[in-house]
């Protein structure tokens, strides 16, 4: 019996039609112009002279650019099949892609020609691209990291696919009304998405609920069958992901949920119009929003349904693609078919959301393909890698056993069997140790039985990585210590990175041009070349040009701030000569926006006390979303806006201190904020932030960092040098040592400026109509134990901010440090991170597409 390898591309007919020559559409302005006009007339049925908005030209341009991507896209897939490349499949519930047009033009080398083509048609590129909505596929750093990784995998030429869900409404659109966050649907798909291509021919059926039937096969083996299920269809939508300066165009495949039977004609004819579409609504709810609220039982069920729907459809697709290439014609199922699976397939789990892929692959191999358990487990473990993104215990997913058993009965059986074998292995390795067994078990028996998804991902993977050196140390030493003691070689670090194409070349053209003029353009694909800037850090001419570029970006950001506040019906003046002090990220207590607010209030009090001459003028910029059910984070947003209203209305603070909260923080807004920032606030409690990538984006754009020794800040300090970063606060070890004896009230009583600021918050100074509004924040700090040690780090933070102010007064010193920060970002490219994944986890090499 021989294994037959099918080397034809998917769906290729026996006698393929003659295809057009590659790049036949042309990459010049005239060809692009013809493409734009053609799509306006023949796709959109619009005459150019009748177009009266930017949407139609945007769509026509996007389709013209996509046409050129597709030529390379098809060639890329043909090359992967011909070369029999090992594929990498990146599974993430989030992809914070931002806008596709600008990034696509840069990566395809079409920016200048496209600008020229639009100009000849009477449009400006900067106007047309504003018509594009940010893709509503992510929330925070997890999704943005995934997007950077896709860019790097395509640029480096790895045969890779991103898999995710096609959310109808994303996370939410954030509005600020009377200082409070109001969530409204993010209708990013309301006008369609010109970049995606639906693939209804590749849809799969995903099962839920039902039961498990046991029987014996002809060989006397126990066979399990999942029966009486409620099914949903998964339909894929593909988006091309072009690499920079290469012929490679990879794929992001997103699943949409559809009902098996979308419309019940009998119910409709009986007058039950709602019931007629009930199945459709129930199915489509799976992909309605990212992270439905888990504060109610229905929300928890929907979240679990999302996660399983995602991994089931994805694994069916991966196995379909594999079996097309490696299959026995005389034995369509069995172990031999999957002999090469782990050699040709690498699956990376981005956090625990896709962890159900472990029991799902086991179910597929054992129940559907007839493999023995041990062989299936060997393949499963050799296929998966797991990336952890948190050290916070409450953020490690755990699902009620009762819920898993009801929705996924066969998977719970498989999880139980994996757990039984795991605990036997633990006992054989360490002897009788009930405490260790309880900690390592896949089932948490305390406070209601729950499935520990992180433990499941660790046990089912051959690699477990953290995303910063400190983060990985904490995982090995504390969070997953038992697993590290059992499998030390399984754990490794892969410090996060960002793509310099989006976060410098695209978002900051003035600085990108200046860097290229100074050291050449090689940094775009080899960030190590930024180190060459260090030799020019004291050059006066470069310093002058550097400040000019920063001021240009500050003016652009100031315009954005004023425009957004005008849209909210508020007048605001921004001093472009002030220090732009920025903290934009998800609103969470551990990220300590509260510490920043306390500093702002302290500065405000100094101004009111007549000490304005000693204070460097600042514009303090906040941004970020709070989870809809996270009431404390939402209260912090109200506090920030309350402080902003008070400070900005006081003549004592005019031109000296301005406080801003930019609503609906997203990638396209970040591309305006990051280049204009001068001080980057990375002030989480040490030992709580896994890595962070915002710190890298700001550093790459010349902002100096004020931060704790947390996450990637530790490595940034090593790269830029102690003199070029502002470090304060307790270390992770000091935090752990202090917690058991920490009395926040003592700090409050011993720091008069702190006590004054806290009392103002609790006394209604920033909520005059509701004096007790912010009392819960004060209670959390003073009587709730101050869990993230905000008060403990206050004095150190204030002293560090004084050092910031002193340095900022000396513009040449600040500029030199800014240049050295950019030079020090050489390590933090997602290209470097992806190479490490490829070499050390996935075992893949680049595939050159001609």
Write out the residue ranges for each language-model feature.
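A conserved ligand/cofactor-binding region detector
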Residues: 2-850
């Amino acid at each position: 019996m021989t294994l037959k390898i099918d080397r034809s591309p998917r769906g290729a007919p026996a006698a393929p039609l003659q295809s057009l020559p590659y790049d036949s559409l042309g990459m010049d302005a005239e060809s692009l112009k013809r493409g734009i006009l053609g799509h306006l007339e023949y796709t959109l049925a619009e005459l150019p002279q009748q177009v009266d908005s930017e949407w139609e030209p945007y769509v026509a341009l996007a389709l013209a650019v996509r046409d050129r991507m597709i030529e390379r896209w098809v060639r890329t897939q043909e090359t992967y099949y011909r070369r029999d490349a090992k594929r990498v499949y990146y599974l993430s519930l989030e992809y914070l892609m931002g806008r596709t047009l600008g990034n696509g033009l840069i990566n395809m080398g079409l920016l200048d020609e496209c600008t020229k083509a639009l100009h000849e048609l009477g449009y400006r590129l900067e106007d047309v691209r504003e018509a594009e909505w940010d893709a509503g596929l992510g929330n925070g750093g997890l999704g943005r990291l995934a997007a950077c990784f896709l860019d790097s995998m395509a640029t480096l030429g790895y045969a890779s696919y991103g898999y995710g869900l096609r959310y109808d409404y994303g996370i939410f659109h954030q509005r600020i009304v009377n200082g409070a966050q109001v969530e409204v649907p993010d209708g990013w798909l309301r006008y369609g998405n010109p970049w995606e291509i639906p693939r209804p021919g590749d849809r799969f059926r995903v099962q839920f609920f039902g039961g498990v039937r046991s029987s014996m096969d002809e060989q006397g083996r126990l066979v399990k069958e999942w029966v009486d299920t409620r099914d949903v269809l998964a339909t894929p939508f593909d988006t091309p992901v072009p690499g920079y300066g290469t012929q490679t165009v990879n794929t992001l495949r997103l699943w949409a949920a559809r009902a098996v039977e979308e419309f019940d004609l009998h119910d409709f004819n009986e007058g039950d119009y709602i019931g007629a579409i009930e199945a459709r609504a129930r199915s489509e709810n799976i992909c309605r929003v990212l992270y439905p609220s888990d504060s109610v039982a229905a929300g928890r069920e929907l979240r679990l349904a999302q996660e399983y729907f995602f991994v089931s459809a994805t694994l069916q697709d991966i196995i379909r693609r594999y079996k097309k290439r490696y299959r026995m014609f005389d034995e369509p199922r069995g172990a031999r078919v999957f002999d090469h699976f782990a050699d040709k397939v690498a699956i990376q789990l981005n956090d625990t959301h896709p962890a159900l892929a472990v029991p799902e692959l086991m179910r597929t191999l054992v129940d559907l393909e007839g493999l023995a358990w041990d062989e299936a487990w060997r393949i499963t473990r050799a296929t998966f890698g797991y990336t952890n993104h948190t050290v916070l215990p409450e953020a490690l997913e755990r699902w009620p056993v009762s819920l898993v058993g009801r929705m996924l009965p066969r998977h719970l059986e498989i999880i139980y069997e994996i757990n039984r074998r795991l605990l036997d292995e633990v006992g054989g390795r360490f002897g009788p140790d009930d405490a260790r067994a309880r900690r390592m078990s896949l089932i948490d028996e305390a406070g209601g039985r729950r499935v520990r998804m992180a433990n499941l991902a660790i046990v089912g993977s051959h690699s477990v990585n953290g995303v910063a050196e400190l983060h990985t140390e904490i995982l090995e030493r504390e969070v997953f210590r038992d697993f590290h003691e059992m499998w030390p070689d399984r754990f490794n670090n892969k410090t996060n990175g960002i793509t310099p194409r989006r976060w410098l070349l695209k978002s900051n053209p003035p600085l990108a041009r200046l860097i290229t003029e100074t050291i050449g353009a090689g940094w775009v694909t080899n960030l190590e070349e930024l180190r060459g800037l260090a030799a020019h850090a004291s050059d006066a001419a470069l310093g002058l040009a550097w400040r000019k570029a920063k001021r240009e970006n500050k003016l652009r950001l100031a315009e954005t701030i004023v425009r957004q506040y005008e849209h909210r019906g508020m007048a605001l003046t921004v001093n472009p000569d002030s220090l732009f002090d920025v903290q934009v990220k998800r609103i969470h207590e551990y990220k300590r926006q509260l510490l920043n607010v306390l500093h702002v209030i302290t500065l405000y009090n100094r101004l009111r006390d007549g000490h304005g001459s000693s204070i460097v003028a600042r514009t303090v910029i906040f941004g970020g979303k709070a989870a809809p059910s996270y009431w404390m984070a939402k209260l912090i947003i109200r506090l920030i806006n309350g402080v902003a209203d008070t400070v900005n209305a006081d003549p004592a603070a005019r031109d000296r201190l301005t406080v801003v909260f930019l609503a609906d923080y997203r990638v396209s807004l970040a591309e305006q904020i990051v280049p204009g920032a001068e001080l980057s606030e990375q002030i989480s409690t040490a030992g709580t932030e896994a890595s962070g990538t915002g710190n890298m984006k700001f550093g790459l754009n010349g902002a100096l960092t004020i931060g704790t020794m947390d996450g990637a800040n530790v490595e940034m300090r090593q790269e830029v040098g102690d003199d070029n970063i502002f470090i304060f606060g307790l270390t992770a070890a000091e935090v752990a040592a202090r917690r058991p004896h920490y009395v926040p009230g003592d700090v409050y009583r011993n720091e008069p400026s702190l006590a004054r600021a806290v009392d103002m918050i609790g006394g209604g100074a920033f909520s005059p109509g509701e004096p007790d509004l912010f009392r819960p924040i004060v209670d959390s700090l003073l009587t709730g134990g101050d869990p993230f040690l905000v008060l403990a780090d206050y004095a150190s933070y204030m002293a560090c901010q004084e050092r910031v102010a002193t340095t900022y007064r000396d513009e040449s010193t600040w500029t030199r440090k800014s240049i050295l920060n950019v030079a020090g970002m050489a390590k933090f490219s997602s290209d470097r991170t992806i190479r490490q994944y490829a070499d050390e986890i996935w075992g893949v090499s680049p595939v050159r597409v001609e």
